[in-house]
Structure formats: structure tokens, C-alpha cells
Regions:
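Active-site-lining helix/loop region of Rossmann-like oxidoreductase modules
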Residues: 9, 13, 151-285, 312, ...
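C-terminal helical cap and adjacent loop that interface with cofactors, partners, or active-site loops
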Residues: 285-352
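A short hydrophobic/small-residue beta-strand
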Residues: 99-101
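Gly/Ser/Thr-rich loops at beta-strand to alpha-helix junctions
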Residues: 12-14, 82-83, 107-112, 136-143, ...
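Predominant activation on well-ordered alpha-helical scaffold segments within soluble catalytic domains
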Residues: 19-20, 122, 143-150, 217-225, ...
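N-terminal glycine-/serine-/threonine-rich beta1-alpha1-beta2 phosphate-ribose binding loop
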Residues: 1-96
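Rossmann-fold NAD(P)-binding glycine/threonine-rich loop
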Residues: 86, 105-130
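Adenosine-phosphate binding glycine-rich loop
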Residues: 128-156, 311, 319
Length: 352
């Protein structure tokens, strides 16, 4: 594989690491786009914090012409958290035959939440012979670590996991998606009420592309795909997280009042035909001073095994996972291919 050329889509917090990691990994940045007028027209070095690179950030409206001009091997997309918000960008990549990998949490396994968009991206990507996928922190810490642990287990009855992270680290879109800053009444109306529906109503929302999955919704689908399990039911419940003191959020540029939602806990429970239950929880909130990231999973069966990761550098791990997956994306079959079908996430340093 020769020198990999990439385009960065989204030049916010996450791109600081994805661009630097990719460049340090021997890749060449040939373009970048964003919607923020404060960075458009500037060299990407102003975001990365390095010497001038010679690549100017353009408006995202120029993405199509940029891809046609520079013909990158891959686009790194670090913008939004839901497929509805990314459909246009990913479709632009697919139509141009450009491989794309995104930190979008729903993109980790979108077939179980946005089947129409996933199917259409899959169709176009196959026509143009490119691959679209999602990766990030969950690829390792909610995915491959768990399936590896399962591989060391004789009999499994349940897989249970919980992961927490600071929404401040991921930008305004993610913070708002978690209900951070809302009153409890607003949270109940705008976030929690969406899950007080029947299975039939949820399936209708999914079919119509109107379902808003929590991050573990797609993770459970990924785990089932990787482990060869057949989901027969899946539900989710979102509850607000609060704090007893005011907390300032730099991402939201506001003070979250004591008792208001600092974020949410989302629990997804999946029952499978094989009799294995997967119950996973993600807690995303504006952290107080004493909070820290944690990741804890247990595989129940023979034997029971638990692993705990305390204070993982979630942002850096997310971005390194994206960059380390790029060779897999380039060599994968065409279409929308989740990383559950790409083999294990591994350390990959490319020659200069």
C-alpha cells in the first residue's frame, strides 16, 4: 500500500488528533472542510497546532469538487453523531468512490437504526467500489475487547457493560444529543419520551428514518454481528443525569444549573435467539470535578469475567482507532461495511 492521501471532514476538537495521528502515521492530508467560518480559509496547522502544512480549510459545500480535484484514498469524517446528519457528506464520498470512516456513533452499526440510509450508502459504495464505515473508541472498548473476552468463555448467558464519558470532550452536537443543559421537564419531553413507545412504534420510526438511537443501540447490534448472534428484541431507556451544584459547560457556553440535566444514561437491552442477553449502558454528561471516564464489562457464564478500564483517554483512543482502521477500510470489500466484518482492531504503522 502506497502513501495514503486523506481529506479531513470537520475541523473541530476531534480533528486535532485525527489529522495529527494520520500525518504522523505516514499519511498525506490533501484537503479539509468545515462549516465554521472561524476556521475556513485557514491552514489546517491552525487546528492541529503545528507548522504550516499547506492545506487550506474549505467550506463543506465545496466537498464534492474537492474530492474530484484531489482524489483522496479516504475521508476522515469527525462531525455529527447521527446518520441523518451525515447522510449528505457520506453520500458525497460514496458517489465519488472515496472510502470514508467516521466517528459518528450511529455509524458503528447503523443497519439497526437507519436501514434506509445504510442501504442506500451500501448500494452507491458498491457501484463506485469504495467502503463506508464507522469506528472510534467503541471499536475497541465496547466491541473487540468484549468479543475477545467472549472467545475465552465456555458458556455465555449475559454480557453487561457500562461506559461513561465527558460530553465536553466531543463538541456541541454530542452534548445536545445527550440533553445536557435541559431542565428535567425539557429532558423528559425532548429525550426520554421518545423511548416510551411500543415495539411497533419504534420499528416504524426506524423504517421511516426517524429513530434517534443511543450509542449502545448500535453497539449491541455490532456485538451481535461480530458474535454471530440473532437479535429478537431490543429496547432502550434514557434517564437524565444531574448534579447538586451548578456546572459550567464550555462546549455549550452555559452554566448547567443544579438539578438540571448534565447529560444522560442510556440503557439498551438486547435478547437473542441464542439465549444470550446483552445489556449495555452509556453515561454521557458534563463532568463535575470528581468525575472520570470508566469502562466496565462483564461476560456472565462459565466463567464470569469482568474487566474495568479507569480513566481511559477516550478522545485520543477514539482518534487513534479511526486512524488505525484506515488500512482496513481501504482493503475491505465495497459497500457499507461495519468494522465487525473487518477483523480485529490493531496497531498499524505505515512506512513513510
Amino acid at each position: 500500500m502506497g502513501k495514503i492521501k486523506f481529506v479531513q471532514v470537520g475541523c473541530g476538537k476531534m480533528s486535532i488528533y485525527t489529522m495529527r495521528y494520520a500525518i504522523e502515521n505516514g499519511m498525506e492530508i490533501v484537503g479539509a472542510v468545515d462549516i465554521n467560518p472561524d476556521v475556513i480559509g485557514k491552514d489546517v496547522s491552525s487546528v492541529i497546532g503545528c507548522e504550516e502544512v499547506g492545506v487550506t480549510i474549505k467550506n463543506v459545500t465545496e466537498l464534492d469538487s474537492l474530492l474530484k480535484e484531489v482524489k483522496p484514498d479516504v475521508a476522515i469524517v469527525t462531525t455529527m453523531s447521527l446518520m441523518n446528519d451525515l447522510e449528505e457528506v457520506l453520500m458525497t464520498c460514496a458517489k465519488n468512490g472515496v472510502n470514508a470512516i467516521t466517528t459518528c456513533e450511529e455509524a458503528f452499526y447503523p443497519a439497526n437504526s437507519s436501514p434506509r440510509i445504510t442501504s442506500e450508502l451500501d448500494r452507491v459504495a458498491k457501484e463506485t467500489n469504495c467502503t463506508i464505515t464507522g469506528s472510534g473508541y467503541q471499536d475497541a472498548f465496547w466491541g473487540n475487547l468484549i468479543t475477545t473476552l467472549a472467545g475465552a468463555t465456555h458458556n455465555i448467558t449475559k454480557i453487561k457493560g457500562s461506559s461513561s464519558y465527558n460530553v465536553e470532550d466531543y463538541g456541541i452536537a454530542l452534548a445536545k444529543a445527550h440533553g445536557a443543559g435541559l431542565t428535567l421537564e425539557e429532558f423528559d419531553k425532548e429525550v426520554a419520551s421518545a423511548d416510551r413507545i411500543s415495539v411497533e412504534e419504534r420499528n416504524k420510526l426506524i423504517e421511516n428514518g426517524e429513530f434517534a438511537p443511543s450509542y449502545m443501540w448500535n453497539t449491541n447490534g455490532w456485538l451481535c454481528d461480530k458474535l454471530g448472534l440473532t437479535p429478537i428484541s431490543q429496547i432502550q431507556k434514557c434517564v437524565p443525569m444531574t448534579h447538586n451544584e451548578d456546572i459550567y459547560s464550555s462546549t455549550l457556553n452555559m452554566t448547567v444549573k443544579a438539578g438540571d440535566a448534565t447529560g444522560m444514561s442510556a440503557v439498551v437491552t438486547t435478547e437473542t435467539k441464542e439465549g444470550i442477553t446483552i445489556e449495555s449502558e452509556c453515561i454521557g454528561k458534563v463532568y463535575a470535578e470528581t468525575d472520570c471516564d470508566t469502562n466496565e464489562w462483564t461476560v456472565y457464564g462459565e466463567p464470569d469475567t469482568t474487566f474495568v478500564v479507569t480513566r481511559p483517554n477516550t478522545v485520543e483512543l477514539t482518534c487513534a482507532s479511526i486512524v488505525n482502521r484506515i488500512p482496513d477500510v481501504i482493503s475491505a470489500k465495497a459497500g457499507y461495511v461495519p468494522t465487525s466484518q473487518m477483523g480485529e482492531l490493531k496497531y498499524q504503522k505505515m512506512a513513510e
